[in-house]
Every structure is written in C-alpha cells, then in structure tokens.
C-alpha cells in the first residue's frame, strides 16, 4: 500500500476556495480505481493549513491518479492560492496489525 501525506497553507483571503477545491478533489479521487482512502483535515494548530491523508492500493494506482488532468489542475490551483509551497510525501507501507 502507498500512503500519501500532503499539506497546503492557504492565504487568509483564499481559505474558503482552497477548502472547496480540496473537498471536490478528495471526493473525486475516492472514485478512482485503487483509492483505498482519501481525506482532508484542518490542522488544529493552524486553521489555514489543510492536511491530506491518502491510501492507494499500489504505486500504479497512485501514478494513474497523478496523471488525471483534474488532479494536475487541482495542484496548480492550490499553488496559486497558497501562502507557502504545498507538500507531498509518499510512503510504502505494510499494515502490521489492526488494533
């Protein structure tokens, strides 16, 4: 399984638009083949920062997600509305145990 974490810190004047675009992106992404989960959360320590957590069945599914034009458009839109650079980190994960 591939785990993706990401974040964006919106400008104060663009937070509502960043939140709207992020929710649309998450909902669309959940319908893609290989998407196990996809969520966005508001950071409790910085209310302008959104944090993304995604799980993908495998790297091929994630690469297909990155190739979707709407995904590329989403990233470009966020970058234009962000206070600082967006972050994306990928992890290759194996579930050890569900507690």
Please place each PLM-identified region on the residue numbering.
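Short acidic, gly/pro-rich beta-turn/loop elements at beta-sheet edges
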Residues: 16-18, 50, 62, 98
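Glycine-rich beta-strand-turn "strand-cap" elements at beta-sheet edges
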Residues: 2, 40-48, 74-99
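N-terminal first-folded block
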Residues: 2-36, 40
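Short, well-ordered beta-strand segments in beta-rich or mixed alpha/beta enzyme
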Residues: 2-9, 39-66
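An amphipathic, aromatic/His-enriched active-site/gating alpha helix that lines ligand/cofactor pockets
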Residues: 20, 24, 28-36, 55-89
């Amino acid at each position: 399984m591939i785990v993706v974490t990401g974040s964006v810190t919106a400008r104060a004047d663009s937070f509502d638009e960043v939140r709207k675009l992020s929710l649309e992106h998450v909902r669309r992404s959940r319908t893609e083949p290989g998407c196990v989960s996809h969520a966005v959360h508001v950071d409790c320590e910085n209310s302008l920062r959104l944090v993304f957590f995604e799980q993908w069945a495998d790297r091929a599914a994630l690469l297909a997600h990155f190739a979707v034009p709407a995904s590329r458009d989403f990233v470009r839109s966020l970058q234009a509305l962000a206070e600082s650079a967006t972050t994306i980190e990928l992890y290759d994960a194996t579930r050890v145990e569900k507690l």
